[in-house]
Amino acid sequence: MTRLRANLLLVATAIIWGTTFVVQQAWLGTLGPIAFTAARFLLGALVVLPLALRQLRSVSRTIRPLQWNDWLLLLVTGCVLFTAALLQQVGILHTQVTNAGFLTALYVPLVPLIGLILLQHQVHWSTWPAALASLGGTYLLSGADALILGTGDLWVIASALFWAIHVLLVAYLAVRTHAPLVVAAAQFLTCGLLGLLASLLFEGPTPADFASAFHGILYAGILSVGIGFTLQVVGQRFTHPADAAIILSSETLFAAMAGFLFLGERLLQQQLIGAGLILAGTLGVQLVPLLFPPSPSPLSLSEPPRAIRAASSASQNSCRK
């Protein structure tokens, strides 16, 4: 798959995620947010599982079977996904939606920053201005009010860190395992089961609650999780995680468009400017590297840093003994 096609898959993911905000607002019913998260990820896992099992058998025959450390990383990725979603939801309960939307977008510059410092990822120079454009656009689109940090905001900032880690883990595992559908199904199942346990402990949902959100669960489970998150994993196998973060941030833009089309919401001038900045960042990270190709680098996404390669090799050798 070409980098352009991979990026288009990520744009499709952002469109699906953006429209899901409208669905959650209209069809959440009386179901608690943690239970809703659990239901949609478990449904998403069921959607992807048959294809994932088929891909797992194929990869085991043609490339290599997944080792115990692969499964451990998949489990960690699911835990990170659940933690990010939970921290974000807790933060939203104690802050304004405007603050939450902007602070969540902090994961956009965090992805290339963490990748550069900890994983030695080399990024094209255009990534940094594109990330700042997306972050600034999100701020304007969310209202550009004075941002006074409270307890809820700190929870959302923590969730942004975990969203950034999740993007990096997905990028690494999609290449490492050669099985993006397995990566998707494993993280969905882990996140869904953790969410189910948390909802039983803290929310106590009833069958009537699940029934009230039936249509929302169907849409979010099949489209947002089953298709959207899976497209993310497939797309990230062929593009840089920093580029993926910027493209996925256009979710905010598509959420605003969906609100305009389906809920009659109107955008102010500053919000339109913000939407333009997000669009510019999304297009820039795709087009600028084509006009100004990067110089060859000894490190690539498909070749992790030396320390990770050495640890992985030693672990796999120990499994063969």
What are these model-predicted stretches?
Residues 1-38, 79, 87, 145-175, ...:
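Glycine-/small-residue-enriched transmembrane alpha-helix faces in small-molecule transporters
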Residues 5-14, 60-87, 129, 151-159, ...:
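Loop-to-transmembrane-helix transition segments
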Residues 16, 20-21, 49-99, 103-104, ...:
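Specific transmembrane alpha-helical segments of multi-pass solute transporters/efflux pumps
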Residues 27, 36, 40, 91, ...:
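Hydrophobic/aromatic residues within transmembrane alpha-helices
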Residues 29-83, 110-114, 162-169, 184-202, ...:
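Transmembrane alpha-helices of multi-pass small-molecule transport proteins
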Residues 37-39, 100-107, 170-192, 225-261:
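Helix-helix packing/entry segments at the starts of transmembrane helices
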Residues 41, 49-57, 213-215, 249-321:
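C-terminal-most transmembrane helix of multi-pass membrane proteins
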Residues 48, 75, 123-143, 160-163, ...:
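Hydrophobic transmembrane alpha-helices of multi-pass small-molecule transport proteins
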